[in-house]
From Swiss-Prot:
SMART domains: EFG_C, EFG_IV
Function description: Catalyzes the GTP-dependent ribosomal translocation step during translation elongation. During this step, the ribosome changes from the pre-translocational (PRE) to the post-translocational (POST) state as the newly formed A-site-bound peptidyl-tRNA and P-site-bound deacylated tRNA move to the P and E sites, respectively. Catalyzes the coordinated movement of the two tRNA molecules, the mRNA and conformational changes in the ribosome.
Taxon lineage: Bacteria, Pseudomonadati, Pseudomonadota, Gammaproteobacteria, Vibrionales
UniProt cross-references to CDD domains, sorted A to Z: EF-G (cd01886), EFG_III (cd16262), EFG_mtEFG1_IV (cd01434), EFG_mtEFG_C (cd03713), EFG_mtEFG_II (cd04088)
SS bond list: none
Subcellular location: Cytoplasm
Gene Ontology biological-process entries: ribosome disassembly
Protein name according to UniProt: Elongation factor G 2
NCBIfam families in alphabetical order: EF-G (TIGR00484), PRK12740.1-5 (NF009381), small_GTP (TIGR00231)
Record carries keyword GTP-binding: yes
Leader peptide range in chain numbering: none
UniProt organism field: Vibrio parahaemolyticus serotype O3:K6 (strain RIMD 2210633)
GO cellular component terms attached to this protein's record: cytoplasm
């Protein structure tokens, strides 16, 4: 199939346990991809194919699947809902044209729903809304619609209404066609009847149809005027065209309801994917960037098979078949045997086997074109975010930017023979997940794993043990503290070394002060005359910048420091670049304490759900953890508490929360910002670091 208007690249995303993976399973059943529907409760779903996913009933990696509906090709990505795996959602949104946001009918707009929604807004991804689990106790479709409006600040365009609720939920009313779809209790998606709207819903259905038409027609002024002034109702085709335009422009979000688990309402969502979500040619084309500056060049990757190749590697995965590179093709074609250029490395790669993925199963293909999401087997030097292009037309697509890890653990193999095996395994895992980092402690020789949260690292350790057979000793989690300064000072430092023959000499006079939050390290020279020759300024900058990696208080990286070199001294024979670099390093060590060096700790944005009768206990516990409560929202099933809490106070929190709430509490957290440590905490952290270093 080469008609790009019949392509839909979509993602399914939501909060943990809202029913994304179950919804994907139902879609695959309806489109004929699978014949027996899997169930997350027993770990048999198609897209959750890792052992860790099947056991925990959560989606960790974004599984890609291709299927067909009404003569349209759907490339679907099922994304994780847990906040520790938000990187997968971000990575998927980067290559999608549309999406389905799944919300739990009883839980409503939950913490990760907000995060995913924010990312989708930033990526300008058109979305449908599916309010799922309306067969559940406490489900309330209209409450969730209100939350979408009030919490997310989005405009839901209600397309279906529930017939019955909780155990009485039997089907939906199609607001536009004014027909009822009623399923029997067999659980089979095809066992439904199209009926007249129940008598007690006729008025409500008519009211929602009027709202739908008025909202949709805001996209076409002529139709709106004819409707309001002359009472002329537009055709269904015109209404659908307006809905499609408004959906593409994020003016509103077509909203559907149902129960994926009970197979009710899914066909209408698939119809909506085809009717309202954009094809690859209808979204803004990907901008091209300057590889040196990262700035947009003003050129774009035109979505056409006739253009030179422009493709983005958005995911690396190592499975039982070997290394897979997932690729979104934006322009041109890619064929088996082609040679492509990796613009990030300047090296060429030969395209070997190309496959379409159905979760962890592969179907080999010979070629792909603009609009396709495929995987290539065995690419050697490609990483996430790299651009693959025609060697004769080099270009760079907008890169992916990933958050820094906030938590780390030390690991070592239980037996000596495991070191090499662990090194190979970790290398593959880092390639797969850019938010997972590794480094070696130079003094202790320990391997340090860094990630986005406890669950993130817990899963990584589990993969090392189970998938790669590496038995590990795992240290306690460590917080990624940072250091900074609080005062501006003026200082001078001289480096002088004489040991026969030519020596070393460098003198620098400098000002050091706190930089703006998020500025990192900035350096400038205002030296006039030749007291510090211009060719040595980069060496001074390099010396200071190198010391930013290890602060003076406890060896943590230093943030937001501004250095100005304004004068100094020079010796015609003994001065050199290395002498000035050493001087800058000594200056950093000398001046940081004088400039009020301060320890910073990561603060997490924490979102807790608790039954109402445990609110006091939960807030009291968060206060004891040095938390600052920002917001409290009462819902029908409990209370959501939002606040900022230091990461160091959140280890093991889920166990405490479950105990306090008799197992009914839930929480999520994501990094918010760095904040100064209280003195007593800073003193303890510094003492702990010194003690650990003494043991090395």
């Amino acid at each position: 199939m080469t008609d790009l208007s019949k392509y839909r690249n979509i993602g399914i995303f939501a909060h943990v346990d809202a029913g994304k993976t179950t919804s994907t399973e139902r879609i695959l059943k309806l489109t004929g991809k699978i014949h027996k529907i899997g169930d997350t409760h027993d770990g048999s779903t198609t897209t959750d194919f890792m052992e860790q996913e099947a056991e925990r009933g959560i989606t960790i990696q974004s599984a890609a699947t291709t299927c067909f509906w009404n003569d349209h090709r759907l490339n679907i990505i099922d994304t994780p809902g847990h906040v520790d795996f938000t990187i997968e959602v971000y990575r998927s949104l980067k290559v999608l044209d549309g999406g389905i946001g799944v919300f739990c009918g009883s839980g409503g707009v939950e913490p990760q729903s907000e995060t995913n929604w924010r990312y989708a807004d930033e990526s300008h991804v058109s979305r449908l809304i599916f309010v799922n689990k309306l067969d559940r106790m406490g489900a309330d479709f209209y409450k969730v619609v209100d939350q979408v409006q009030n919490v997310l600040g989005a405009t839901p365009l209600v397309m279906t209404l529930p017939i019955g609720i909780e155990e009485d939920f039997v089907g939906v009313v199609d607001v536009l066609s004014q027909q009822a779809y009623v399923w029997d209790e067999s659980g089979q998606p095809e066992n439904y009847e199209v009926q007249e709207i129940p008598a007690d819903m006729v008025d409500k259905a008519a009211e929602y149809r009027e709202m739908l038409i008025e909202t949709a027609l805001e996209q076409d002024e002529d139709l709106m005027m004819a409707y309001l002034e002359e009472g002329e109702e537009p055709s269904v085709e015109d209404i659908k065209r307006c809905i499609r335009k408004g959906t593409r422009d994020l003016a509103f979000f077509p909203t559907y309801c149902g129960s994926a688990y009970k197979n009710k309402g899914m066909q209408l969502i698939l119809d909506a994917v085809v009717d309202y979500l954009p094809s690859p040619t209808e979204v803004d084309p990907q901008p091209l960037t300057d590889p040196d500056t990262g700035e947009a060049t003003g050129e774009v990757a035109t979505v056409s098979a006739d253009e030179p190749l422009k493709a983005l590697a958005f995911k690396i995965m190592d499975d039982r078949f070997g290394a897979l590179t997932f690729i979104r093709i934006y322009s041109g074609k890619m064929k088996k045997g082609d040679t492509v250029l990796n613009s990030a490395t300047g090296k060429t790669e030969r395209i070997g086997r190309m496959v379409e993925m159905h979760a962890d199963e592969r179907n080999e293909i010979d070629s792909a074109q603009a609009g396709d999401i495929i995987a290539v087997v065995g690419m050697k030097n490609v990483q996430t975010g790299h651009t693959l292009c025609d060697p004769k037309h080099e270009c760079t697509l907008e890169p992916m930017i990933f958050p820094e890890p906030v938590i780390s653990i030390a690991v070592k193999p239980k037996d000596k023979g495991g070191s090499e095996k662990m090194g190979i395994a970790i290398g593959k895992m880092v390639a797969e997940d850019p938010s997972f980092q590794v480094e070696t402690d130079e003094e202790s020789g320990e391997t340090i794993l860094k990630g986005m949260g406890e669950l993130h690292l817990d899963i990584k350790v589990d993969i090392l043990k189970r998938t790669y057979g590496v038995e590990l000793e795992v240290g306690a989690p460590q917080v990624a503290y940072r250091e900074t300064i609080t005062q501006a000072i003026e200082d001078s430092y001289t480096h002088k070394k004489q040991s026969g023959g030519s020596g070393q000499f460098a003198k620098i006079d400098y000002r050091i002060k706190p930089g703006e939050v998020g500025s990192g390290f900035t350096f400038k020279s205002t030296v006039v005359g030749g007291n510090v020759p211009k060719e040595f300024w980069p060496a001074v900058e390099k010396g200071f910048a190198g010391m930013m990696e290890t602060g003076v208080l406890a060896g943590f990286p230093t943030l937001d420091v501004e250095v100005e070199l304004y004068d100094g001294g020079f010796h015609a024979v003994d001065s050199s670049a290395i002498a000035y670099e050493i001087a800058a390093k000594g200056a950093f060590r000398q001046s940081m304490p004088k400039a009020g060096a301060q320890l910073l700790e990561p603060i997490m944005k924490v979102d807790v759900f608790t039954p109402e009768d445990h609110v006091g206990d939960v807030i009291g516990d968060l206060n004891r953890r040095r938390g600052m409560i920002k917001d409290q929202q009462a819902g029908t099933t409990g209370v959501r508490i939002k606040g900022d809490v230091p990461l160091s106070e959140m280890f093991g929190y889920i166990g405490t929360l479950r105990t306090m709430t008799s197992g009914r509490g839930q929480f999520s957290m994501e990094f918010s910002h760095y904040s100064p440590c209280p003195n007593n905490v800073a003193e303890q952290v510094i003492a702990d670091v010194k003690e650990r270093n003494a043991k090395k």
